[in-house]
Amino acid sequence: MCIRDRRSTQYDSNRSGFYWNDHIRAEQNAISDFEFDKKTAKALLEQGIGLVNTHIKDGVVRGTGALIALDLNGDEGTRILSNKSGQYLSLSRSIQSRQTYPTSIMGSMALLRQLYYDADWYEKGNIKNTDLTLEAFNQNTNLTQIFAAGSRANAIRADKVGDQFDIQYTILGGGDEFERIEAIKNTNATFIIPINFPKPYDVEDPFLADRLELESMREWNQRPANLSALENNEVPFAITMQGLKSPKSFKTNILSAIEQGLSKSEALKALTTVPAQILKNDKVGNLKKGSFANFMITSGDFFESNATVLEHWVRGSRHIFEDLTQKDIRGTYSFIAENDSLILEINGSKHKPLSLIHI
């Protein structure tokens, strides 16, 4: 039996006092829905992440984001570094609205262009009624404009919209920029690049292997080299963990990118100074006088697989993961137990030793 969906098509906005299209939500502020999760924050700190920039991922225009310090010992007053860290845009509809338009990427681009014209008209006082969306949109134009493109094709499309209105977007890419690297470079944009690389395919099953497409294999093979391609072509970028299912994959995937040619110095910049520049915040991403005391103490070179985070300081607040005062007991020891001579061998790491007794 088939049950017909009797919901009528929605053409107009169902919000009063806001923009005529519900997929434009410039009045949203991420800080309004912010809740600090200590468990998640601790997991991020252990992986070397001390600050998080977040926003509401919903709509063609998504409102403002928030920059949060992951201080487990502080409160909201010290954790919130910026309650308006940027204005966020995309080509995706809002899940909060059933309004029909736009129905395609091209429709989203047309809607965005119309928004810029309407915002300019509104700012010049040509509209008597108050529009809370346009007011918020105009107020946020002095912030960094971050466009969630999600692919190299959409990045180029977004840049064309920005060029039309003399706006240089910072573009959240899709990790496939290497496929159109010249066009990506010509955008003159700073990119935010995800490192959610595809996992290896299981080719032991001949049936599944036969169905595996060459394009998918190429993507799996080449995506870790994307950051190296950006570096070699002098495209500025920051690294994001967006799209990763586990914080533990963050460093693992960075090391994969380094194996594929990304320099350690560029990786460090992509995690520190470049994000700070994107967010126009000179108190983070560096250790200069007057900046926040944000730094890590590690067991070795952070970009080595066996290096661990021993301590993570956020705004001068200390978070200890492994005790620096712990003595190194690794070595080989001989002792006698019940008249038997035994050898005790302790190896492993200093903070996680492993023991083996030889009889």
Predicted regions located by residue number:
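His/Asp/Glu-enriched, well-ordered alpha-helical/loop segment
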Residues: 15-19, 25-27, 144, 190-298
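C-terminal cap of metal-dependent C-N hydrolases
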Residues: 292-325
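Tryptophan-anchored aromatic micro-motifs
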Residues: 325-343, 351-356
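Conserved small/polar residues in nucleotide/adenosyl-binding loops
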Residues: 1-5, 357-359
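Glycine-enriched alpha-helix->loop->beta-strand junction motifs that scaffold or abut catalytic
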Residues: 162-168, 186-192, 236
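Short, charged, surface-exposed secondary-structure boundary motifs
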Residues: 7, 180-183, 200-207, 308
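Polyanionic/metal-chelating signatures
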Residues: 36-178, 282, 302, 308, ...
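Metal-associated gating/positioning segment near the N- to mid-region
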Residues: 4-55
